[in-house]
Amino acid sequence: ADKLLYALRDVTATVDSIPLIASSIMSKKLASGADSIVLDVKVGSGAFMKNVDSARCLAKTMVELGRLAKKPTIATLTNMEQPLGCAIGNAIEVIEAIETLKGHGPKDFTELCIDFTTEILMVAGIEKDEKVARSMVEDAIHSGKGVEKFREMISWQGGNPNVIDDYTLFAQANEIIDLD
């Protein structure tokens, strides 16, 4: 249905309509059954929302929709004026996420993940104190609990959890073009 609505927004020149963008995003979040919602609104040249004002408006609209649905919801703005992390492409971005869970990720991506997960713990009511929540996240990375939870999540979804230990199990590109 979302694809059809996006096509309709395209032909009616309402692709940039913040209320329609917000309702599209939040309808999926609410339909998933989440108890609380933490949103990462990207802003800048590498994002759909090109300026801070429109990103802030989108964030506020989505938070209000969450409030109306009686779901604790917060939104953060992330600067996308430059790439985040070092990887570009589905498989290698997942590998970068796994490396981050193992404590070996790029500094900028690791910091964003820690900040974001700290917010999740607080919004979900797991921990009220930000310093304690952050410490819990850092401990999950350093102890290996985070990557083990990801391994469980892969299994729950019918995936092969061995990809965490053997990156060659990821699908490889059908064609590689040398640009030299």
Where do the protein language model's features map onto the residues?
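Well-ordered secondary-structure scaffolds
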Residues: T12-S24, K28-A31, D35-D180
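Self-splicing inteins and homing endonuclease
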Residues: A1-L8
